[in-house]
């Protein structure tokens, strides 16, 4: 008979690569998968802006709200450019992310109209800034549109290139005969107001909307403009009108244009085309949700436990969803992979059936370069041949929602486990490299950890906290413990924090009162003892594990 915790695990069902909850069908973004990506994006009459992301990535979580808001505000452009997302943390999408060279999240790629993937079109990366704002996204996107037009593409867009003439005489020279009215927004050189309004109103007939920059000094002088933005209205008879009030914001500027056109018997057109379609929402509640909640509560009561399931899932995720998405691994990346596999081979709690798997991986990396798909094949073969003792899902690292905890939590635990066991297994080895595990972690996070902002933070912290100066194996355990607490302190109260698992300094006074001095300072010797007890090989919990894989003698 199954024990209560094991029964709950069965009832909760598998959550190995769940569909992320950052984007939903009701959002104004197109949800792409491997099943529809090529059908929608390749040879499309419109351009596409695709964000490649992972739902667990903190930077992606911060990026999602402004990206969705941008999609909403750009909805009138939908016949020109589609705003979409594709989740690379869903294993089914790995081939797409690998083929398009997506190794850091979030990555936004622009695919111009009529892209041909077989011809080598992989899209162009659109810069992103931190902190992320809707305005920054718009600015970078519109600059991309302008670059496309300057390079002879972007034929679907209205004219977004700056008006360069010194007067208005040639304004209509390149316009069709049915264009009767022109609106020229003269603005600061770092403004994109004119371009945004031109895109919003691109379907309005008989009208062209252009923009000029204030560094066009001859035009500014000839029109006697002293304030920016200024709206210049011109018709075919060269009648001009200059408006400087109530046009600083998009809504006001569009209202001014609409009012002028209404007096001419014309109406602005700002229709929003339909979306191409999305994954459908399940109208029924998840019958397994209650079991999952109960399971989390049971696991939480077990305290600071380390589960074999989290360690194995972390390793498989790292190899299948990060290393494998790199199309070709060579140079520094390959050296980092070798170092990572070296500490995995030495210290990871594999079962007895793992020798050929880990040897095949290390032999693969002995060449000058490795294809990511080769790593994927070896891990999938290992899964099929019983190398791993657990299903691919998180247990102690399962968050209250799919976007919380998960892989980052398990990766921290994996490296804590490796640092502790490098101490325990090298007691008599005075020549052991004190930064063997930390160096492998640094290389992995730098070259493979796909949350770009997280990777940058860790690399910066490693430099500031002198990772390379660690002089003993026990010091490496404490270095990583302190670094993790620094991250916990920085992320406490952040939007990425799981409300059911608030960030705390670890270990808590409740779990390890002896770790605290009377004045609240850390007693590091006690902390080290606690970490050794927690992460020692014989402390690992095997809930949900097939122990016959780990300890074959048990079935006799």
At which residue positions do the language-model features occur?
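N-terminal leader/targeting and pre-domain segments
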Residues: 2-47, 77, 81, 86-91, ...
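Thiol-based oxidoreductase modules, predominantly thioredoxin-like and allied folds used
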Residues: 28-34, 52, 64, 72, ...
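Local sequence-structure signature of Cys/Sec-based thiol-disulfide redox active-site neighborhoods
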Residues: 35-74, 164-203, 434, 438-448
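A short, hydrophobic beta-strand/beta-hairpin element that forms part of a small beta-sheet core
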Residues: 48-49, 67, 83, 103-126, ...
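Non-catalytic interaction/regulatory modules that flank or connect domains
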Residues: 170-236, 240, 321-326, 337-347, ...
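Long, low-complexity intrinsically disordered regions in eukaryotic proteins
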Residues: 177-179, 203, 218, 222-225, ...
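Oxidative protein folding and maturation machinery
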Residues: 283-437, 444-458, 466-467, 471, ...
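Alpha-helical bundle/repeat cores within regulatory domains of eukaryotic proteins
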Residues: 417-537
């Amino acid at each position: 008979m199954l024990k209560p915790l094991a029964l709950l695990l069965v009832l909760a069902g598998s959550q190995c690569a769940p569909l992320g909850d950052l984007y939903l069908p009701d959002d104004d973004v197109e949800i792409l998968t491997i099943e529809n990506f090529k059908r929608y994006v390749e040879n499309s009459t419109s351009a596409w802006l695709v964000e490649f992301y992972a739902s667990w990535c903190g930077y992606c979580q911060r990026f999602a709200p402004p990206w969705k808001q941008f999609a909403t505000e750009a909805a009138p452009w939908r016949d020109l450019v589609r705003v979409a997302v594709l989740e690379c943390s869903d294993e089914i999408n790995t081939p797409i992310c690998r083929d398009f060279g997506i190794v850091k999240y979030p990555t936004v790629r622009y695919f111009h109209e009529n892209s041909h993937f077989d011809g080598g079109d992989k899209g162009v990366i659109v810069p992103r800034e931190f902190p992320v704002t809707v305005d920054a996204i718009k600015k970078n996107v519109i600059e991309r549109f302008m670059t496309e037009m300057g390079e002879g593409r972007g034929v679907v867009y209205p004219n977004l290139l700056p008006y360069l003439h010194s007067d208005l005489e040639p304004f209509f020279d390149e316009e069709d005969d049915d264009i009767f009215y022109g609106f020229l927004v003269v603005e600061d050189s770092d403004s994109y107001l004119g371009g945004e309004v031109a895109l919003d109103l691109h379907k309005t007939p008989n009208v062209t909307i252009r923009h000029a920059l204030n560094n066009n000094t001859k035009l500014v002088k000839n029109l006697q403009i002293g304030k920016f933005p200024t709206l210049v209205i011109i018709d075919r008879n060269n009648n001009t009108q200059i408006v400087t009030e109530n046009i600083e914001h998009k809504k006001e500027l569009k209202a001014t244009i609409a009012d002028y056109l209404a007096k001419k018997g014309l109406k602005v057109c700002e229709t929003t085309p339909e979306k191409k379609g999305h994954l459908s929402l399940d109208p029924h509640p998840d019958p397994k949700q209650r079991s999952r909640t109960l399971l989390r509560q049971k696991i939480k009561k077990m305290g600071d436990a380390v589960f074999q399931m989290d360690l194995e899932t972390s390793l498989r995720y790292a190899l299948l969803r990060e290393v494998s998405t790199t199309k070709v691994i060579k140079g520094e990346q390959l050296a980092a992979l070798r170092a990572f596999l070296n500490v995995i081979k030495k210290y990871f709690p594999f079962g007895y059936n793992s020798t050929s798997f880990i040897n095949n991986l290390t032999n693969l990396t002995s060449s000058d370069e490795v294809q990511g798909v080769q790593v994927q094949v070896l891990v999938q073969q290992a899964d099929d041949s019983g190398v791993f003792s657990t299903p691919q899902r998180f247990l102690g690292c399962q968050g209250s929602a799919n976007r919380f905890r998960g892989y980052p939590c398990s990766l921290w635990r994996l490296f804590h486990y490796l640092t502790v066991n490098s101490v325990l297994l090298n007691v008599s080895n005075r020549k052991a490299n004190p930064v063997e595990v930390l160096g492998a972690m640094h290389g992995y996070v730098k070259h493979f950890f796909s949350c770009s902002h997280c990777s940058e933070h860790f690399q910066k912290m490693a430099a500031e906290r002198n990772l390379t100066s660690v002089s003993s194996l026990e010091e490496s355990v404490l270095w990583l413990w302190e670094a993790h607490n620094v991250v916990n302190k920085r992320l406490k109260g952040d939007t990425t924090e799981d409300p059911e698992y608030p960030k705390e300094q670890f270990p808590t006074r409740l779990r390890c009162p002896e770790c605290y001095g009377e004045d609240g300072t850390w007693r590091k010797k006690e902390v080290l003892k606690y970490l050794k007890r927690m992460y020692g090989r014989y402390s690992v919990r095997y809930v949900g594990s097939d122990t016959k894989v780990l300890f074959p003698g048990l079935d006799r």
